[in-house]
A protein has these predicted regions:
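Alpha-helical segment proximal to the catalytic Tyr-Lys
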Residues: 128, 172-176, 241
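Short C-terminal tail/terminal secondary-structure segment
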Residues: 18, 148, 193, 215, ...
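Short, small/polar-rich loop/turn modules that mediate ligand/substrate recognition or access, typified
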Residues: 175, 180-182, 243-245
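Active-site helix of classical SDR
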Residues: 123, 159, 167
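Residue(s) in the substrate-gating loop at a strand-loop-helix junction
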Residues: 143
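Catalytic Tyr-X3-Lys loop
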Residues: 94, 101-121, 139, 156, ...
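Canonical Rossmann dinucleotide-binding motif of NAD(H)/NADP(H)-dependent dehydrogenases/reductases
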Residues: 2-35
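Substrate-binding pocket helix/loop in short-chain dehydrogenase/reductase
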Residues: 99-100, 107-109, 138, 201, ...
């Protein structure tokens, strides 16, 4: 029996070839039915097709996490298709590698719309659905840069810091409501994903920039999307039934420095 057998999960940003897709596939391989959301519908459909091809169950939807209406739609899709919602992986994010002094107001606000508003809207929409069937687990993907500052991407860092404390606040709120919903955050370090590759390109690319990111982790190399997916699986499963309001750093030692 899988570690999340029979549970229904929503994964945002699930159409990317990074953490979202890998997490969706891992949850499905452990028995979850997965609703894959992504701003790029083709990517979401590709992830769902990969799950179905391996014998799992999945549906896909074009989903803008910065839209409250979009959240109502994806929650309803989960309920209409599978009858319940047990897991929410708030994975979708925007990363612009610029110092704050070089960041435009539009860039700052857009990152907050995706990274902060998206998590806020998602939790508010998912919790009532989870309460219908006795609880659930929310995993918010923050960042190591949400715990310490990051001069090369200040707006991203501040947005992920907001996710960190919003997670703790909602965990306490759910505990007070006694609704059996756990809320935790994961803090990746430098993980080799398309989003990080784009960020490295924004900073000029090349071996020097890659070396800068590799050097952030005392372990001396970039992490993999599966490292994060394994953390999501743990926090979504009953193995973590006494864990809420926690921050799980999967970062090669980045924040230990």
């Amino acid at each position: 029996m899988g570690r999340v057998e029979g549970k229904v999960a929503i994964v945002t940003g699930g159409g990317s070839a990074g953490m979202g897709r890998v997490t969706s596939l891992l949850l499905a391989s452990e028995g979850a039915k997965v609703v894959v959301g992504d701003i790029h519908e083709a990517g979401a459909k590709e992830t769902a097709e990969q799950i179905i091809a391996t014998g799992g169950q999945a549906v896909a939807l074009r989903h803008d996490v910065a839209s409250e209406e979009g959240w109502a739609e994806i929650i309803q899709l989960a309920l209409d298709t599978y009858g319940r919602l047990d897991i929410l992986d708030n994975n979708a994010a925007m990363f612009i590698a610029k110092p704050l002094m070089e960041t435009s107001t539009t860039e700052f606000r857009r990152q907050n719309q995706v990274n902060v508003d998206g998590v806020f809207f998602g939790m508010k929409a998912a919790i009532p659905a989870m309460e219908l069937t006795g609880g659930g687990a929310i995993v918010n993907i923050s960042s190591g840069a949400g715990i310490v500052g990051f001069a090369a991407a200040g707006a991203y860092s501040s947005s992920k810091g907001a996710v960190r404390l919003m997670t703790k606040s909602m965990a306490l709120e759910c505990a007070q409501r006694q609704n059996n919903i756990r809320v935790n955050s994961i803090h990746p370090g430098p993980i080799l994903t398309p989003m990080l590759e784009q960020g490295m390109d924004d900073l000029g690319g090349g071996d020097e920039v890659r070396g800068m990111f590799e050097g952030m982790a005392p372990m001396g190399h970039l992490g993999e999307a599966l490292d994060i997916a394994n953390g999501v699986l743990y926090l979504a499963s009953e193995e973590s039934k006494y864990v809420t309001g926690a921050e799980l750093a999967i970062d090669g030692g980045f924040i230990a420095q």
